[in-house]
């Protein structure tokens, strides 16, 4: 099951988690304090940084399928991360907004290359689909070890070395992942699809460079003009879904039904990640404004590092969830992916219910203890691990092989759309520059917002359970269609 190749890839995944989430956690204060952005604009930029990268997984999936292959795409992605973080170093040192935006634009595009390529290549390092499905949640936890350390340590690190020092460390970590990809190149290429084993033509390299330049320029424009940028995200996401539907309509009946289930699961994933996106935007802003004290009285936690509690619990959740579902399957108890997403919404409703209670009952000191955020992230993280690991495995299990990478990129489209929608929602609780936080603001503005999210999470539980029934019927119909074709071929 485990071998040198998938272990090496998990090292790269950890380096990604350390560097990317380390950058993300310090971006909020970097834009608020060094670049003098207000709360609303800061939440939009940080939300977009978490969202636009997955959006360009559309291009990443196309590039991996048609031009470069998964291995080359992933290797170039780590080069892009290292280069983007290096630009952030220069932007922070010179307090240069355009250079900083260019850095996060390049890192966002690199994430777009990585998102569809990593699971596709990682899957090929296992002998069976079952081994891959059982081990993918472990990989998710490895990513979260990196994310935990990055999100917890970077806020304290920048107090010593400054923002430019934090960005420099991220560049070095991304560089380490790049070196590892080069070190195990031979083994990964042998395990890869045929496209990775063939040389790339000059024409394809030129097309890749041209497309990449255009995409990076577009991302920079979107970060510089977020009002227009969010509409571009909606348009690109919508176009990707329309293109997928067009492919679905041209497919045979069995493939069409399977692709239809991917659309349903993409909708559920989008709704879930609207909640996940609050962690980087509204929940971080609430923590900065209200969270005070050490965790359990002795563990120092910077307010913006509260989101580090998420990967902490995700790291714990991965093996537990894998163990629970494996034991249930041995007892012949099987839940569909949509039903599992429904379980995630139950956990999400509990998490936001706790947050709603915390802000509506806050005292005159406007203080919320770190332990409250720890409890919130416990429930949210378990839901995230279910969606983050199970949905990708489901898509890979039903997607036609010739559009496998593009199908996986729909998962990233869901993250992108939800990230922007969630960031837009979050701006409703943003304070003006210099506005003082009060008990009334926390109880009413924050309270009403999180109460609405809690109610909607409960509604989504019912929708997910209904979707589970529909998906089951569609997959049964797809199987029947395949059997009919096989029977006709056998009789002809």
PLM ranges: what are they?
Residues 79-95, 343-365:
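C-terminal ends and interior cores of transmembrane alpha-helices
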Residues 25-41, 279-305:
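Short amphipathic helix-loop junctions that connect adjacent transmembrane helices
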Residues 133-152, 158, 173-177, 181, ...:
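Glycine-rich segments within core transmembrane alpha-helices of 12-TM secondary carriers
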């Amino acid at each position: 099951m485990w071998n040198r190749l998938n272990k090496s890839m998990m090292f790269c995944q950890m380096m990604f988690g350390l560097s990317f989430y380390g950058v993300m956690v310090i971006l909020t204060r970097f834009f608020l304090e060094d670049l003098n952005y207000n709360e609303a604009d800061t939440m939009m930029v940080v939300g977009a940084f978490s969202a636009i990268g997955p959006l360009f997984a559309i291009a990443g999936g196309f590039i991996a399928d048609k031009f470069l292959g998964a291995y080359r795409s992933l290797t170039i992605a780590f080069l892009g991360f290292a280069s983007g973080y290096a630009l952030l170093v220069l932007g922070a040192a010179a307090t240069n907004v355009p250079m900083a935006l260019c850095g996060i634009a390049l890192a966002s595009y690199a994430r777009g290359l990585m998102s569809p390529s990593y699971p596709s290549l990682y899957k090929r390092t296992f002998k069976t689909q079952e081994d891959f499905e059982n081990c993918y949640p472990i990989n998710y936890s490895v990513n979260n070890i990196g994310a935990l350390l990055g999100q917890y340590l970077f806020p304290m690190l920048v107090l010593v070395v400054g923002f430019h020092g934090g960005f420099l460390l991220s560049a070095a970590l991304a560089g380490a992942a790049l070196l590892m990809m080069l070190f195990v190149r031979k083994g990964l290429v042998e395990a890869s699809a045929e496209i990775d084993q063939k040389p790339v033509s000059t024409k394809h390299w030129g097309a890749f460079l041209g497309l990449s330049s255009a995409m990076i320029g577009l991302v920079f424009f979107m970060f510089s003009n977020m009002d227009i940028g969010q509409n571009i995200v909606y348009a690109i996401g919508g176009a990707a879904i329309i293109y997928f539907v067009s492919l679905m309509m041209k497919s045979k009946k069995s493939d069409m039904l399977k692709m239809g289930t991917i659309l349903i699961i993409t909708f559920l994933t989008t709704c879930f990640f609207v909640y996940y996106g609050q962690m980087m935007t509204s929940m971080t802003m609430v923590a900065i404004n209200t969270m005070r004290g050490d965790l359990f009285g002795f563990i120092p936690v910077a307010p913006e590092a509260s989101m580090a509690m998420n990967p902490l619990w995700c790291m714990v959740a991965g093996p537990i969830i894998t163990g629970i579902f494996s034991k249930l399957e041995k007892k012949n108890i099987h839940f569909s992916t949509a039903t599992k997403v429904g379980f995630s919404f139950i956990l999400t409703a509990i998490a936001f219910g706790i947050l709603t209670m915390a802000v509506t009952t806050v005292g005159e000191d406007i203080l919320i203890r770190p332990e409250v955020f720890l409890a919130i992230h416990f429930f949210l993280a378990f839901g995230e691990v279910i969606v983050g690991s199970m949905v990708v495995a489901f898509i890979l299990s039903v997607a036609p092989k010739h559009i496998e990478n593009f199908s996986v990129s729909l998962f990233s489209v869901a993250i992108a759309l939800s990230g922007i929608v969630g960031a837009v929602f979050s701006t409703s609780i943003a304070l003006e520059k210099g506005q003082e936080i009060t008990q009334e603001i926390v109880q009413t503005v924050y309270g009403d917002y999180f109460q609405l999210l809690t109610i909607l999470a409960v509604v989504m539980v019912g929708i997910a359970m209904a979707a589970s029934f529909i998906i089951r019927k569609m997959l049964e119909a797809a199987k029947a269609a395949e059997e009919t074709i096989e029977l006709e071929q056998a009789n002809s």
